Amino acid sequence: MADYDSAKYWSKQGARRGLQKTRYYCQICQRQCKDANGFQSHNKSPSHLRKISQVTAEDARRYNIQFEKGFLQLLKQRHGEKWIDANKVYNEYVQDRDHVHMNATMHRSLTQFVRYLGRAGKVDVDMDIDDTSENVEGPLLIRIHPSSLSSPSEDGMLRSQQEEQEVIAAELLKRQLNRAKRQTEKVYQPEMKSEISGDSTLKRVQVTFHGNGRVNKKKKKVPPRKDGIKFR
């Protein structure tokens, strides 16, 4: 059994609680792998390769936007405009099981992502943003700009996304109505046919007329009188 203070012990405890390394999570398949070997095997599986072939540039762009937006919102809501370690913010962000993972974005590491935010002017970074090295001495301090989440470009992008969602919802509603209409027509048409074919009480009545159409009444025979007088 591993020691209480060993890394192996806490790794097993994290696995029991369902806390796995985010680097071994497949965002496309939404599957968490246990270690590097499992993640590598998953990347070679037919189901994963099939889904990867269906990913478009718009999907990758959406992952980048969602990851960046979620990170910045958490930074602003919990820490305001004070300086904070980026690693602490990231650890808080990944506690949400439904978050977009970094390995699904264009960012290779948290350091590279923080430099990207600094160059974009969305956060203040206490480091050289033009440096390309991944090793940073000390904490990776960042501070958000007050206007970083309410820029006009992002507001316009959100409006366009809402309009697109409304168009998609209207199209889906139209399809559902047409499908329901077709199903209703299929139900009523067989019922009408069965009612017509099942009514066997009606029969044809043939009427035939002879002669000129007049009805001749038979004359009543009158017995002869005893006195010999005849009446016509």
Curated annotation (Swiss-Prot):
Keywords assigned: DNA-binding, Metal-binding, Nucleus, Zinc, Zinc-finger
GO function terms (MF aspect): DNA binding; zinc ion binding
One Pfam family cited in the UniProt record for this chain: WH_KIN17
Localization annotation: Nucleus
Keyword Zinc-finger belongs to the record: yes
Zinc finger C2H2-type: from-to: 24-48
Source lineage: Eukaryota, Fungi, Dikarya, Ascomycota, Saccharomycotina
Underlying gene: RTS2
Stated name of the protein: Zinc finger protein RTS2
Matches recorded under InterPro entries: C2H2-Znf_KIN17, DNA/RNA-bd_Kin17_WH-like_dom, KIN17-like, KIN17_WH-like_sf, Matrin/U1-like-C_Znf_C2H2, Znf_C2H2_sf, Znf_C2H2_type
GO cellular component, one term: cytoplasm
Start and end residues of each stretch annotated as Disordered: 180-199, 211-232
